[in-house]
From Swiss-Prot:
Residues involved in Fe cation binding: H96, D98, H157
Binding-site residues, 2-oxoglutarate: R167
Pfam entry (one): PKHD_C
Annotated ranges, domain Fe2OG dioxygenase: 78-176
Known EC number: 1.14.11.-
HAMAP family: Hydroxyl_YbiX
Keywords: Dioxygenase, Iron, Metal-binding, Oxidoreductase, Vitamin C
Keyword Metal-binding part of the UniProt annotation: yes
Cofactor binding comment, as recorded: Binds 1 Fe(2+) ion per subunit.
Gene3D superfamilies: q2cbj1_9rhob like domain (2.60.120.620), Rabenosyn, Rab binding domain (4.10.860.20)
Entry annotated with the keyword Hydrolase: no
Species of provenance: Shewanella oneidensis (strain ATCC 700550 / JCM 31522 / CIP 106686 / LMG 19005 / NCIMB 14063 / MR-1)
Record's protein name: PKHD-type hydroxylase SO_3913
The organism's place on the tree of life at top rank: Bacteria
Length: 224
C-alpha cells in the first residue's frame, strides 16, 4: 500500500526548514547504506547526530503522529529518526531494498514502512523521481515540497539521477503495530470507511459495530 500525504508542512514551513538544513555540513550519504546499497548510492546526507537535523527530525515525527491519515495508514509504534539527503549533479540511488532492522539509542526498529518527505519544489530540479515497485507495478513519485509518501519497506525502489537542480528530502523508517502489510491495508480501508460514514452521519449503531470490528481486529493483529 502506497499512500501520498499532501501538505504535511506548508510552503512557508518548508522554506524555514530548508534555511536551517542548507546551512549545515553535508557528508557522503553512504553512512546509512548496507553493503549492497552502497555500490548503487551517490548523494549527500546530514550526519545523523547533527543537532539541527535531530531537532527538525523531532518536529517531523511530532507532525506525523498528529496527522490522522498517517496514523491510520501506518499505525506507528516506533520511528527510526528522520535523516536528510540531497541529490544534485547526477546523484542517484539505484534499485535497492531497505535494511530490515535498524539500531537506535533506544533499541532495535523493524522497518515495516519507509517514508520520504519532499523538501524541494517540483520546479527546483529535474529527475530525482522515487520509483517504487510493488504488487501493483511500478510507480514514479515526485511530490510538492512539504508532502510525504509512505510505502512498505519490502518494496524495491530507486531515486533516478538528478540531472539539474537540487533535490532535498527527509527520509525515515518506522515499525508498525501491525507487522503484516495486508492486515494494515484492511485496517486502513476499514478506518477510512468509518471516517467517511461518520462525516455522512450514518446510523449510529452501524458505526458502533464497524468501530468495534476495527478495534477487535487491531487487538488481534497488533504487536506491542
Amino acid at each position: 500500500m502506497l499512500i501520498e500525504i499532501p501538505n504535511v508542512f506548508s510552503k512557508q514551513e518548508v522554506n524555514q526548514l530548508r534555511e536551517q538544513l542548507d546551512a549545515r555540513t553535508w557528508i557522503d550519504g553512504n553512512q546509512t547504506s548496507g553493503m549492497m546499497a552502497s555500490t548503487r548510492k551517490r548523494n549527500q546526507q546530514l550526519d545523523k547526530d547533527d543537532p539541527v537535523a535531530l531537532q527538525i527530525g523531532e518536529l517531523i515525527m511530532a507532525r506525523l503522529l498528529a496527522h490522522p491519515l498517517f496514523v491510520s495508514a501506518a499505525l506507528p509504534l516506533q520511528f527510526y529518526p528522520p535523516l536528510f539527503n540531497r541529490y544534485q549533479g547526477g546523484d542517484t540511488f539505484g534499485y535497492h531494498i531497505d535494511n530490515a532492522i535498524r539500531s537506535t539509542s533506544d533499541g532495535m526498529v523493524r522497518t515495516d514502512l519507509s517514508a520520504t518527505l519532499f523538501l524541494s519544489e517540483l520546479n527546483a530540479y529535474e529527475g530525482g523521481e522515487l520509483v517504487i515497485q510493488d504488487t501493483y507495478g511500478q510507480q514514479s513519485i515526485k511530490l510538492a515540497a512539504g508532502s510525504l509518501v509512505l510505502y512498505p519497506s519490502t518494496s524495491l525502489h530507486q531515486v533516478t539521477p538528478v540531472t539539474s537542480g537540487e533535490r532535498t528530502s527527509a527520509f525515515m523508517w518506522l515499525q508498525s503495530m501491525v507487522r503484516d502489510e495486508g492486515q494494515r491495508r484492511l485496517l486502513f480501508q476499514l478506518d477510512q470507511s468509518i471516517q467517511t460514514l461518520t462525516a455522512q452521519q450514518a446510523a449510529e449503531q452501524e458505526l458502533f459495530n464497524l468501530t468495534g470490528v476495527y478495534h477487535n481486529l487491531l487487538r488481534r493483529w497488533s504487536e506491542l
